[in-house]
Amino acid sequence: MAPSPDHARDLYIELLKKVVSNVIYEDPTHVAGMITDASFDRTSRESGEDYPTVAHTMIGLKRLDNLHRCLADVVEDGVPGDFIETGVWRGGACIFARGLLNAYGQADRTVWVADSFQGFPELTGSDHPLDVEIDLHQYNEAVDLPTSEETVRENFARYGLLDDNVRFLAGWFKDTMPAAPVKQLAVMRLDGDSYGATMDVLDSLYERLSPGGYVIVDDYCIPACREAVHDFRDRLGIRDTIHRIDRQGAYWRHSG
């Protein structure tokens, strides 16, 4: 008996997760922060707690599973809108999203790839105190963070997923988000780490999120990022339950 189309689709999606996170070839990690051993560690890779030297994403399998579920939900529930990730590194999560939407036959949904493509910005006196305290700019060289738009495009092309449904928004979020040509969103995935980057995206794009859509916050564990989320939600009176994905990420579903 031939496998069902749904079975073949699901096999492709599960394989794509393993490829973008590179749990197949097990590349080592950069030594930075609390990581002192460069050896591949499967537990750290699955939970997205290392800095891969080769893999196209560092969010790990648990957060890829969450992205899978959120995207599948909006497709199956008929929630209209596109997908955006703000802070994409090498593009792996966006590549996964494009592959999944393609596998579900979602020809009308765009994947928006938003990043400075320069790593974290240098801080100024006007930045939020929690951003100044953590100073993410120091990680740019330590974990090979800055990735050019050209490299991310090449990564999409390697998977055969660089098409007209993939659009790039290059620049700092404070500049690109207010005028972003995004009309409607079904899933927005925030991975800017800082208070400023998180707030810039929420302020500009949350109103474009369809009821039933998802907000995923990759770095909810970082105090600056978490405070931005709660400041924004308190200001708008958002009471939708925040669910933890793992030790780092969280999400909520927009009740409308």
Swiss-Prot record:
GO biological processes: antibiotic biosynthetic process; methylation
Annotated keywords: Antibiotic biosynthesis, Magnesium, Metal-binding, Methyltransferase, S-adenosyl-L-methionine, Transferase
Function description: O-methyltransferase that catalyzes the conversion of macrocin to tylosin, the ultimate step of tylosin antibiotic biosynthesis. Also able to mediate the conversion of lactenocin to desmycosin.
Family of the protein in this entry: Belongs to the methyltransferase TylF/MycF family.
Active site (UniProt): D65 (proton acceptor)
Protein's name according to its UniProt entry: Macrocin O-methyltransferase
Methyltransferase as UniProt keyword: yes
Gene Ontology molecular functions: macrocin O-methyltransferase activity; metal ion binding
Name of the top EC class for this enzyme: transferase
Binding site for S-adenosyl-L-methionine: 57-58, 85-89, 115-119, 173, 191-192
Organism, as annotated: Streptomyces fradiae (Streptomyces roseoflavus)
Binding of Mg(2+), residues: D191, D218, D219
Reactions it catalyzes: macrocin + S-adenosyl-L-methionine = tylosin + S-adenosyl-L-homocysteine + H(+)
Gene3D superfamilies xrefs: Vaccinia Virus protein VP39
Activity's dependence on pH: Optimum pH is 7.5-8.0.
Domain of life of the source: Bacteria
Quaternary structure, from the entry: Homodimer.
Pfam families documented for this protein: TylF (PF05711)
